[in-house]
Amino acid sequence: VRLFQRTTRSQSLTDNGALFYERCLRALEEIRGAESQLETGKHQVSGRLRVAMPVLFGRQCIAPLLIELAQEHPGLELEMSFSDRIVDLVEEGFDMAVRNGTLADSAVLVARRLGVHRMVLCAAPDYLIKNGQPQSVDDLRQYTAINYTRAGRVLPWQLMDYDGTSRTFIPRSSLNMDDLQAICDAALAGHGIAWLPCWMVIKEIHQGNLVPLFKQAPDVRFDVHAVWQQTPHLPLRVRIAIDMLVKRLPAVMSLEFPASIKKPR
């Protein structure tokens, strides 16, 4: 039976070849499913787990949890990749990725929400003593902002007024940086107001090094997801990693001063 159609310039599958290829893919899926069931039956997590994640968020929040998981399961070989680009899980061979914000539609990927980022507007106490504390979003125009840039563009702040109205504020400043840690360091040094995720500033806030602003206003949150390639049989090592992150990640990202929860409209 002829499976390939060859010419001097190209090669393609015949109808029989395409049918054979599809059957082979199904057979491989059945084998993977059988392996997954064997793993589940033994309750042993083993094999290599490749996870992609954003650099700072991954380093501070995700990596410590996954390392603990690997220590609990000696048969698990953990490989973590830190990058702020959107990796191609299929082409680059990752088992799963952690992604922040809105996800693009995909026919080949599955997602599960792990938790939410809570964004915090904050500044150093010395800066606020010197310049006063803003009382509303409109007041921010009178203050120095420390901007986050991506691809040369200043990203706007998504804020909430006290009545829950969503506001998009584009800060104007001579301080523009494409690294969140550098922005946090500049805020700690008293150079202005910064809009940062709470997991990055929680310790500094509780130690009194940064002061959260607009605490009584509803806060803005962004979803965090785990994504993986769609498959009828998810390997046990991937499923256990996702379940662990769902259970433990929200506490890592929390901030303990009370506020209502509201998403931007």
Task: Describe these PLM feature segments.
Residues 1-13:
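A short LG(V/I)-centered, amphipathic sequence patch enriched
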Residues 12-40:
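Alpha-helical "hinge/linker" immediately C-terminal to small N-terminal DNA-binding modules
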Residues 22, 75, 199-203, 207, ...:
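C-terminal effector-binding regulatory domain of bacterial HTH transcription factors
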Residues 47-108, 258-265:
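Central regulatory/effector-binding core of bacterial HTH transcription factors
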Residues 77-82, 147, 168-179, 217:
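Short beta-strand-to-loop elements that line the ligand-binding cleft
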Residues 107-119, 123-146:
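Flexible hinge/capping segments at coil-to-helix
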Residues 144-163:
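Secondary-structure junction motif
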Residues 184-209:
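A ligand-binding cleft/hinge motif common to bilobed small-molecule-binding domains
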